[in-house]
Amino acid sequence: MSLPASFDLTPEDAKLLLAANVHLGAKNVQVHNKPYVYKTRPDGMNIINIGKTWEKIVLAARIIAAVPNASDVAVCSSRTFGQRAVLKFAAHTGATAIAGRFTPGNFTNYITRSFKEPRLVVVTDPRTDAQAIKESSYVNIPVIALTDMDSPSEYVDVAIPCNNKGKHSIGLIWWLLAREVLRLRGIIPDRTTEWSVMPDLYFYRDPEEIEQNAVEEAKTEEVEEAPVAEAETEWTGETEDVDWADSGATPAAEDAAASNW
């Protein structure tokens, strides 16, 4: 049985996945993740089959697009590298973002102010977002997760095999997922039309690095705006010939010789 054309990985997307190191998996392999291993390197690192990664991205996007109300999809990331990505994903698709620490009882304790009743949960890492997955299992909410080769698969309904520890890998997977959701909703007309949003927008940025870059840019602007004083006259290394007899002036050496010491 052949898959639809949308499940075919394009060369451009394959280059993006490889450039972001999505294919670099962990050395340990959980039994349910074995079908996603393409090969094992001599150093023990497992290479993920990015073709299957793309198939799972398309499948997850179809599940997300099938939810009538976009805000009923909760996207979670306790991992620092994924917090910016889930916020951007929520902004572009209308989902509800839970970035940072997941408050226990968000899905089960209706007394809390942060209580939510999503119809679908998407998490960045089954280990760091274990509380969200556990509560989803209590209230029968399906879970989509970005899973590495060593990630646990309990209560995960759809696993997207990828490197869920690198900031570029996490950002790119969320970007591809958002783009596919927008394609299915018709916001992006067809697959030949490129999305105007760059993947860099989903990448984690270190606040200290941002401040340092801002300081360096300010210094560069100050140096460029400072006026450069130009010399009014240029010395050519040539001396002018002066006729001391006509001018009535005598050189300093002759004055010194004529004086009475």
From Swiss-Prot:
Record-level GO BP terms: cytoplasmic translation; ribosomal small subunit assembly; translation
Biased composition (Acidic residues): 222-244
One cellular component term from this protein's GO annotations in UniProt: cytosolic small ribosomal subunit
Region entry Disordered, spans: 217-261
Entry-linked SUPFAM superfamilies: Ribosomal protein S2 (SSF52313)
Pfam family, one: Ribosomal_S2
Residues the record lists as N-acetylserine modifications: S2
One function term, GO molecular function aspect: structural constituent of ribosome
Keyword Ribosomal protein: yes
Subcellular location: Cytoplasm
InterPro entries cross-referenced by the UniProt entry: Ribosomal_uS2, Ribosomal_uS2_CS, Ribosomal_uS2_euk, Ribosomal_uS2_euk/arc, Ribosomal_uS2_flav_dom_sf
Annotated function: Required for the assembly and/or stability of the 40S ribosomal subunit. Required for the processing of the 20S rRNA-precursor to mature 18S rRNA in a late step of the maturation of 40S ribosomal subunits.
Quaternary structure and interacting proteins, as annotated: Component of the small ribosomal subunit. Mature ribosomes consist of a small (40S) and a large (60S) subunit. The 40S subunit contains about 33 different proteins and 1 molecule of RNA (18S). The 60S subunit contains about 49 different proteins and 3 molecules of RNA (25S, 5.8S and 5S). Interacts with RPS21.
Entry similarity comment: Belongs to the universal ribosomal protein uS2 family.
NCBIfam families on file: uS2_euk_arch
The name this protein goes by in its record: Small ribosomal subunit protein uS2
